[in-house]
Regions:
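Structured extracytoplasmic
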Residues: 40-189, 197-202, 207-226, 234-241, ...
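Bacterial N-terminal signal peptides
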Residues: 23-34
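Sec/Tat signal peptide C-region and signal peptidase I cleavage site
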Residues: 35-39
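N-terminal polybasic/positive-inside topogenic patches
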Residues: 16-17
Length: 296
């Protein structure tokens, strides 16, 4: 049930702290979810680029209700620090376990800290509630951002690359962004890739066309040129998921504090787990990595 809606999280992280309503939101995840049971085919009749974008958005939102759970490996780099984690999705939220830092396995002390963190989540009702609230918040705001995609931009055909059709996009001058996050989103231009056979969103690559100011610049701003990139693929037959995230944003918060977000993520080694999996069962899986690896 992993979705690109977790991607908008990166955009949210680039906003001045005083302006963020949900630090866990924005996962522009702008895209995704799971698999079409009956994918729509592209009609033979000419279709405008905006109509194609709208159909893709409708499909992705429809497929969000997929409730399959997956285990996968996350490689991420932020502020010069590299981490590798194993993630297991459950009906109660996702559980992660840190495997390495800067290409080095965890020390004995770090292993104990990870054990304690996972154990605390298993026994703390408040921690579990916080996890569920974060999941619900990111899903809700991700849907809102994704839903406005066809209205926020003007699309045009820009060629094709293999099985993908490339659409270029620019801000729609008549669109009025309803939120700060939407303003950052709307002030981008770039390219979007669509798998026309299944009408799935395969990629989104945008950059800020101008400096985005908050509170007339008094509360902060994001610099022109900030870059956001997401890739999605059919990771196993019939299942689409996010595989790559890139985010680079700079700016100022409250006139003085610098904003510098550089984030990279790669998602790989997807493995189906039970749709009824609990957090306790996920913790057990994460403690048996060799067994899971043998099943891949």
């Amino acid at each position: 049930m992993h979705s690109w809606f977790k991607t908008c999280d990166g955009l949210a992280a680039s906003l001045p702290v005083t302006l963020k309503r949900n630090s866990v939101v924005l996962t522009l995840t702008i895209l995704l979810l799971s698999v079409p049971a009956h994918p729509q085919s592209v009609p033979n009749s000419p279709t405008s680029a905006n109509d194609l974008a709208r159909r893709v958005v409708t499909n992705e939102l429809t497929f969000q209700d997929d409730h399959t759970n997956w285990m996968y490996r996350l490689e991420k780099e932020q502020y010069g620090k590299k981490q590798v984690e194993e993630i297991v999705e459950t009906k109660e939220g996702s559980l992660s376990r840190l495997l390495s830092i800067n290409d080095q396995p965890l020390t004995a002390k770090q292993q104990l800290e990870e054990d304690q963190r996972v154990r605390e989540l298993m026994t703390s009702r408040s921690a579990q509630q916080k996890l569920r609230r974060a999941r619900d918040a990111e899903t809700l705001q991700g849907r809102r951002l994704f839903k406005m995609l066809p209205d926020a931009f003007v699309f045009s055909y820009a060629g094709d690359e293999g099985n993908l059709v490339k659409l270029s996009f620019r801000p729609n001058p008549s669109f009025r962004a309803p939120s700060l996050e939407a303003r950052v989103f709307h002030d981008m231009e770039g390219e979007m890739w669509v798998d026309c056979k299944q009408e799935r969103l395969a990629g989104f690559d945008g950059h800020l066309t101008q400096t985005v100011k908050f509170g007339f610049g008094l509360l902060g701003h994001l610099d022109k040129g900030g870059h956001f990139e997401v890739r999605q693929a059919e990771v196993v037959p019939g299942h689409w998921d996010m595989i790559t995230l890139r985010l680079e944003m700079t700016g100022k918060a409250l006139l003085f504090a610098s904003i510098g977000v550089q984030k990279k993520e790669n998602h790989q080694d997807f493995y189906r787990v039970s749709d009824d999996l609990t957090l306790v069962q996920a913790a057990d899986i994460l403690n048996r990595p060799l067994v899971v690896a043998d099943n891949r």
